Amino acid sequence: MATGGLAKWVGAVQAFGHPSWSYVIKLRHGHVTMIERGFYELCGGENWNMLHELPGDNGLLEMWESRESMLESWSPGDGHSWAMAWAGWRAARETMQRRQYVNEPTFSCWSQSELGENGWHVHIIIGGPGLTRQNAAISRSILCTSFFKHLLITIRQRTHAPYTVLSRDELNAWNWLQKIAQRVMRGDMDDIVDILKCRKANGTLVAQAINGTEFITRYMLPKNRKVANTVLTRHTTPEQSYDSTWGKTYGFAVCNGETVSEFTRKDLWKVLYNIYTAHPAENMLNSNPSVWGDLPRVSANRIDADDAEARSRPIKLSRKQKIMAEVIQRATDGLLLTYNDLVVHLSDLMLMLEGMPGGSKTAEQLLTMIHIKLCAKYNAYEFMLMKTPATQNMNPGAPHYDCQGNLVFKLLNLQGYNPWQVGHWLVMMLSKKTGKRNSTLFYGPASTGKTNLAKAICHAVGLYGCVNHNNKQFPFNDAPNKMILWWEECIMTTDYVEAAKCVLGGTHVRVDVKHKDSRELPQIPVLLSSNHDVYTVVGGNATFGVHAAPLKERITQMNFMKQLPNTFGEITPGMISNWLSHCAHIHQEHLSLEGFAIKWDVQSVGNSFPLQTLCPGHSQNWTFSENGVCWHCGGFIQPTPESDTDSDGDPDPDGAVAGDSDTSANSESTVSFSSNDSGLGSVTSSAPSVPDRAEEIEEIPSECLEWMREEVDRLSAHDINSLAHQATGFILDPIPEEPEERERDLAREDAEPEASTSHTPATKRARVEEGEPWDGTQPITEGDWIDFESRQKRRRLEREEKGGEDEDMEVQESDPSAWGEKLGIVEKPGEEPIVLYCFETLPESDEEGDSDKENKTHTV
């Protein structure tokens, strides 16, 4: 039973040393109700069942007297609450002995055990000489170690008594305490013991000195008693010390080596409260409590939020920290991505920062912070629109698109790709919407525009990194905190192929960084440009093809096979921004893999990107770029023949050229292309645009024929194959004739050889021979390309030889005198001409006597 009068306790609390320090030792457990009985009995408690039999608010008023008598004769504070409070006081005494270097230290101590939601804890308030701000925080380890030492000593004294057998609950509690004590002995006690702290102006936390008397009065005393989770506070708190307005609870309290009486606790609080916390204004308000009767009720959440807001204080930054925060803010607003940008645009702040200790290292850290902040906020396409805004306005209602000299359209048309389709795919890839196909490869020989296009895209984005495959240990050293990755002249080796597959597929992976820990690399779009076979992995002197299939599933390949002229020019970031922004605007409803397949009528996007399919009347020739670009196929719209002028005459209002009577007279064979229908073009004529006979080509003006021949000679086999379906008379061959008609034409040519040379023969249409790989794809590897060129050269030689033999036959048939030279008969001077007799079979109806009339003589 607790002892001591009220006056003694008032004097003990008032005599508390100043300054004082408040410590908390925590014994955490996730399930308190499962272990509290074993912990109670392990510490010597013997009345667990009696605690649950104490009467409470059950209406049995006649039992109140028996409850008070029971509390007088037995204190329910025995067991773990009692053991923890006394262990706290003994630990405080041992700590002050070491600080004052005496066996009987002079100090004041209040030790109080309490039960919380996640376990038990002990408040220890210590005041006295030897404990200062410098060593108060360090003393936590001494106090915690001593506390568990005395707690375990108390338990061992009870368990080592004769005839003591531990129950299962007690064994569980003992194992739990042993684990906590072992952590303390190892020094791992950061979440076990703590001291009340405050934050200084520079942001550091230091031990906070308190007034022990006021702290005990305001915080430690106004609490009801609770020793177990399953027992109400009303059961274990005496009537004179119980207050229903107190929401806090305690278990047991010790002050200066004596037990604080639970019967005089409320009286002690009243006396100390009137001395240290009472205010004249409070007395005035307490005299008229009805003033607060009509106030609205405020929820506990609102009160907690207000308290948290009141406790929050603005963090005071140092001068260096303010400069760093200003640099990050300005660099983020101005999109400054490199150290050079910071020096040029924030020279004053960088000068101040470099003048401080460690300024260069701080600048690198600031750049990393800026990159992390931008990458977390934008993707590559969104950031490109901010870094390199579009400078060209687009009119979707126009019949055609005005590219205004954008070299991207010239390059992609030359290489056989639709600029709108390629731009649609790149916008999706930069927006991270292409799934596993997270990378695009520009493949082909040198000087075909691969690097030109990849470099312009990366510079338009701005925040890009490069892959250095020469450094085989850290190839992706520059990849973290970037929006797009550029791999120039990509080569795959066994050293980094596995990491490369993760990066190319957009998988989150950690990559090694030189002189630093590994960094996480989230999904980042990758652009590759190479003239090597990136699907063949090289390891030492061996090559492996097992990685080809996984790599092709991650890479979308575009083949650039036509070399560019030296005067092609450089693609600028502004061209890329205009092109991609217009592509995104046109296809804004199809920016997904499903939308891409529906828009371009493809089953799926494989490793080989689809080639361009031109609309009728549209060309890949940059000469026609001034007429605009088709909204659908991306080709250049050709001019109409009516707009062409002859060098010898001026155009008339009807579209015929003055001075060319043949063209103006025959209007049935006129072919014209209109620029309406959103730039798709249409063929309009009064008669079929394809002539019915080969000789009808003579009606087309000679200037048009020359231009057609030049265009046919310039076009490659692949270009003509892709244009074979177009219904234009200057590209297609004449319609095949019937055998009878063809024989009559040949007979007419034999009879009148001079007529065959009066007009220019129709140009032959280049054809793609059977077996050539131009079936919608292009040569992939360098070996395929060499085989293709050798087959082309062999077939060209065969056609030339065949064409030479045909010409010789024509010459021989047109000049009969060549027969004599072929037979070796040469006319010599002074000799008579040699007469050759040629005999022919006579019809059966002729008479034999007239056979000599059928002989023909030819003089050589």
Swiss-Prot record:
Catalytic activity: ATP + H2O = ADP + phosphate + H(+)
Location of the SF3 helicase domain: 418-573
Domain notes: In the N-terminus, the endonuclease region is involved in binding to the origin of replication. In the middle, there are the ATPase and helicase activities. The C-terminus probably contains a transactivation domain.
Ranges for domain PV NS1-Nuc: 1-145
Record-linked InterPro entries: BoV_NS1-like_N, Helicase_SF3_DNA-vir, P-loop_NTPase, Parvovirus_NS1_helicase, PV_NS1-NUC
Region of interest: Disordered: 641-696, 728-860
Residues at which ATP binds: 444-451
Motif (RCR-3): 85-89
Region (Transactivation): 629-858
Feature: compositional bias, Basic and acidic residues: 741-750
Physiological role: Multifunctional protein which displays endonuclease and helicase activities required for initiating and directing viral DNA replication. Also plays a role in viral packaging and transactivation of several promoters. Binds site-specifically to 2-3 approximate tandem copies within the origins of replication (Ori), unwinds this hairpin region and nicks one DNA strand thereby initiating the rolling circle replication (RCR). Becomes covalently attached to the 5' end of the nick and provides a 3'OH for priming DNA synthesis.
Protein name from the UniProt record: Initiator protein NS1
Active-site residue list: 219
GO cellular component: host cell nucleus
EC numbers: 3.1.21.-, 3.6.4.12
UniProt xrefs under PROSITE patterns: PV_NS1_NUC (PS52022), SF3_HELICASE_1 (PS51206)
